[in-house]
Amino acid sequence: AYTLPPLDYAYTALEPHIDAQTMEIHHTKHHQTYINNVNAALEGTSFANEPVEALLQKLDSLPENLRGPVRNNGGGHANHSLFWKVLTPNGGGEPKGALADAIKSDIGGLDTFKEAFTKAALTRFGSGWAWLSVTPEKKLVVESTGNQDSPLSTGNTPILGLDVWEHAYYLKYQNRRPEYIGAFFNVVNWDEVSRRYQEALA
């Protein structure tokens, strides 16, 4: 069964950009609920011991009765597990090395990336995510998904994600999603994103 991954920092650590109350509720309540639900759906099946990312990659071949729960709750678990890791206190700044080079060659540079990523997060109607992903051709792409859909299900590997469900920002930012997106760039853990980029290339 899946379990809630501990955070590498305190709930207060991302203040003032992401508030402690949001972090605690988001982690212990929302993420935990996705885990409880996907565990319940997979209990007693041969899929219960597989990494959730592997199930999302082969979503279309899963038994029909499991597709919905894995897509929604398994997606919620995988997406949030990535989200916590790509955040860090004293984050932000700029990516370095191979990732910086790829952002330049594939997307047009950091400013262009931030613009595209902000647009993806802003124009996602309703709930969903903005992503920086690696395609099967090993190219970087900015994309967005609805609800808890994962880029893994369409063959891409997400390396940076931003949750734009209202539960991720409403307590502090209410309807000011643009402000939340701007604040996110101050807590991005580019070292972790770079690590995930290298992993996706392997």
UniProtKB/Swiss-Prot annotation:
Per the UniProt entry, the Enzyme Commission number(s) are: 1.15.1.1
- SUPFAM superfamilies in the record: Fe,Mn superoxide dismutase (SOD), C-terminal domain (SSF54719), Fe,Mn superoxide dismutase (SOD), N-terminal domain (SSF46609)
Q: Which InterPro entries match?
A: Mn/Fe_SOD, Mn/Fe_SOD_BS, Mn/Fe_SOD_C, Mn/Fe_SOD_N, Mn/Fe_SOD_N_sf, SOD_C_sf
Top-level EC class = oxidoreductase
UniProt keywords (A-Z) are: Iron, Manganese, Metal-binding, Oxidoreductase
What Pfam families does the entry give? Sod_Fe_C, Sod_Fe_N
Cofactor(s) annotated in UniProt = Mn(2+); Fe(3+)
Provide the family line: Belongs to the iron/manganese superoxide dismutase family.
How is the quaternary structure described?
Homodimer.
Q: Which reaction does it catalyse?
A: 2 superoxide + 2 H(+) = H2O2 + O2
Protein's recorded name: Superoxide dismutase [Mn/Fe]
